[in-house]
């Protein structure tokens, strides 16, 4: 049966409305708003993911062909900056450590890093909600004071190039029985640093991408606001170049409402593989976030997206409307070749980019 003109008209109208709604939802900050607030662009450099590190994220067997050169560079640059020595037997510059950030500065790379808050309200730089992967300690950052963190070495018994720390004694008990030592361990080690100390080390030498981390990106509570306020206060007193980003649209919106002059970015990815949640409600929210339909909340200046999704309709549309696409996390020359024309900036680890 042929379609009636009335049905076709309604279908076309519905499609136009849906397309218009998608464009409205995904649209970044307007050019006039950028001009009015003198918003800087995302500096055009390579960004070292969690610093230039010799242990931690991305250093898996999958990338072993190129990661050796990367680890060697991280150690060389860290030692040049005064961290460790050729005689240091273990890890010198673990991810998100002062040594890793100093190494990135020495190599001339920008830095991507992560902010969380300790039990006593200190803003620290660490990615995961707990210390298991980076210190073999299952305790959560939110349950530890900064003083305790200074006595917990990152990758304490691991060799350079390790992607995960070996579990501490009693870490795998149920419940875990790990406790913080009364005194700092002897010898060289790195621990979770204060954000204030990271800013002192970087001292404006390279630009920063600062990510605000939260346990649940679909919620917003007073402790989350406290992290925003304290992190921003440190950045307001900092004279170097930086931009901010978060998976949580409410965090990016906080900057929209309170610091419109700061370049802000929405982090996202298309849920897939092992990282995909089994909760159908949460998964629906993740798919919506991956489609960038919450960008109307934050109106970002850039979209930091999993590099696999650079050719997706939502990223291409955001780029067309003026958002700067930033890839994460590129871990080989082959991955860079696959996504280089889809993104304008790149966050990398586990290989040394040819373009420096």
Question: Which ranges hold each PLM region?
Answer:
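Phosphate-group recognition and catalysis centered on beta-loop-alpha active-site segments
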Residues: 2-356
